[in-house]
Structure formats: C-alpha cells, structure tokens
Amino acid sequence: MSRTGITVVLALALSSCARAPAFSVIAFYTGKEDAAHISFLHEAEQWFPKVAAKNNFRFDTTSNWGNLNAGFLARYDVVVFLDTRPEDPAQRAAFQAYMEHGGAWMGFHFSGFALTPSVYPANWDWYHNTFLGAGSYVSNTWRPTAAVLRVEDPAHPATRHLPHTFTSSPSEWYRWENDLRQNRDIDILLAIDSTSFPLGTGPKPQEIWHSGYYPVVWTNRNYRMIYFNFGHNDIDYEHKIDSTNRTLSYTLGNPVQDRLIIDALLWLGDKEAHSDRRASR
C-alpha cells in the first residue's frame, strides 16, 4: 500500500475513533403519572439528545421496564430514571445488582417518591433507605416555584463550575423522612438556601415552607449515583388559559441548572473520575 493509502486509512480510523461515544446512557420512563412529570419527560426527550451530541455520549430512552435486566443493562454505562421507579421484583434486583457492580444512575424528582399508602408504597428498602438514603416522601411545597439553591460541596465534579448560590427552575420540592445530614454515606451537593423562604404559594399553609433544611441534590458515596429533586413543571391544572393542561414552566433551559446536570452526567460516565474520588476519601 502506498504512503498516501496508509495516510487515508489512518485518517479514517482516527475519525471513526473520534466519533465513538465516550459512554452510553439509557433513560427509563413511564410517562403516565401527573401532567407535570409528563411535561418534564417531553422536555428531557428533546434536551438530552442535543446534550449528548455536543458532549460525545450516546443517549437512548425506553418505556419498557422489562429492559431492566442484566443483559440489557450491560450495554449501558449510565441509567437514568426520568419519572418513576421499577415495581417488578426481578427488575429491582437487576437494578440493584447493576449498581453494586459499578453501574451509574441519575434520578429525577418522582423517581425518589415512596409513600404508604399510595400507588408507590415504601416497599423497596434498599432503594429508598440504603441507596437514596431519604426514606419515604413526607410533604411538598405547592405550587411549583423557583428556589435559591446553595452549593454544599463545591469540590464535587458536578458542582465545581457552579456559583455558590443560584436560582433554580420552578419545581415542586419534597421533604423526606430521613435527615440526610446524619447519613455518612450521603454527600449533599445542593440544598435550599434560606433566602428562598417563604417557599411555595399554597393555598394550603403546609404547602408553604418558612424554615428548615431541605437537600435537593445528593450522591451516595458507595455508588456512582446522583439524585435531583427537581423535575416537576408547573401546569395550568385549573385551565385558566385553555383546556390542555398547558405547561407554565420548564425544568431545562436554565443555564446554571443545565450545567449541573451535564457535569453530573459526564462525571457518572467517567469511571476513572469516580474511582479517583472514592480513593481520595
């Protein structure tokens, strides 16, 4: 083969390598519970592929929770729960095994929800208490409103490009059964800053928070994972505009909050970065 031919082959090989995704992400969703969660899901389905193209990773979605099995998960480096959690025992076992053997996970808002009695009862102890650490849902603010979020761990790869405080996109915010500050495995990355209070507009008094400590983003040091409490858009439930349950606010498109999600995903996709951080503890 001529030198020119070799050069062409090498160039093509290098070009192919450059286009190879750095890691692969699979996002699971249900898309059936609450118009606000479905609105966020539709956002995510448009936003994540654009982010993936810009940051050289692969992003796929599925609403088939039957894919939560060892064979399917082996194709992916990161799993995302966009709205709900798995309910089938075999799917739960497969997800736990995936995480305990080095898999990575990102969860949004309702994926952390558990309440007995409800359609999503507190019946998965490993996930809600060991993995997430938060236990059951206790209460929430209403309506979805923006909050001032404060960075609690500025050294984490997901937060190191963020200002000390910033204003989030509107969301419904959860209060949890467990105090995450008392859990040594949990690294709280962001919490609601006191300048947010009063947070929520009601109309019920308990839906407006006036004080307290509320984590909204955290990781578990024993796993490659991150949880975001946001992911609930404001909806025209009262049909003041029209009869379509129109979306009144969006989770994505906030530059600072977007940076948090992107950096968190790049961190999850980088196994070496995670290993280095655990080794430095």
Model regions and ranges:
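Helical hinge/lid and interdomain linker segments adjacent to catalytic or ligand-binding clefts
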Residues: 24-115
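Bacterial N-terminal signal peptides
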Residues: 5-15
